[in-house]
Structure formats: structure tokens, C-alpha cells
Amino acid sequence: MAEKKGKTVTVEQIGSPIRRPAEQRATLIGLGLNKMHRRSTLEDTPAVRGMIAKLPHLVRVVDEA
């Protein structure tokens, strides 16, 4: 499978989804996160940036490459 060359962003979950709205939980799953301190590396797209912006209290950007 061909690997895409492009910018990536690594995010880490820093907050618990317990007692959060279902929409925020779904956004975490969309980012590939579901447990505390897990990291996920994703393509740096406007959609991913929008999901990160919706959850500033639950995720942090670790690395932008």
C-alpha cells in the first residue's frame, strides 16, 4: 500500500470522556483516542484540526510534522 507523504499531527488524550456529551465522545473516537494518555498520529487536514479545536480540554497536540 502506498504511503502518503504529507504533514501529520500527533495528539494525546489528556482528559476523561466520563460525564461528557456523546458528541465529544464520538469526536474522540474519530481522532482514534479512547483512553487516557493514548496518542494518535493523523494527517494534518482541516477536518482533523476542527476536531482538535472542539476538544481543547480533552486533547493536546504533541507533535506537528
UniProtKB/Swiss-Prot annotation:
<dbReference type="GO" id="GO:0006412">
    <property type="term" value="P:translation"/>
</dbReference>
<dbReference type="GO" id="GO:0003735">
    <property type="term" value="F:structural constituent of ribosome"/>
</dbReference>
<keyword id="KW-0689">Ribosomal protein</keyword>
<dbReference type="Pfam" id="PF00327">
    <property type="entry name" value="Ribosomal_L30"/>
</dbReference>
<dbReference type="InterPro" id="IPR005996">
    <property type="entry name" value="Ribosomal_uL30_bac-type"/>
</dbReference>
<comment type="similarity">
    <text>Belongs to the universal ribosomal protein uL30 family.</text>
</comment>
<comment type="subunit">
    <text>Part of the 50S ribosomal subunit.</text>
</comment>
<keyword id="KW-0687">Ribonucleoprotein</keyword>
<dbReference type="InterPro" id="IPR016082">
    <property type="entry name" value="Ribosomal_uL30_ferredoxin-like"/>
</dbReference>
<dbReference type="InterPro" id="IPR036919">
    <property type="entry name" value="Ribo_uL30_ferredoxin-like_sf"/>
</dbReference>
<protein>
    <recommendedName>
        <fullName>Large ribosomal subunit protein uL30</fullName>
    </recommendedName>
</protein>
<dbReference type="GO" id="GO:0022625">
    <property type="term" value="C:cytosolic large ribosomal subunit"/>
</dbReference>
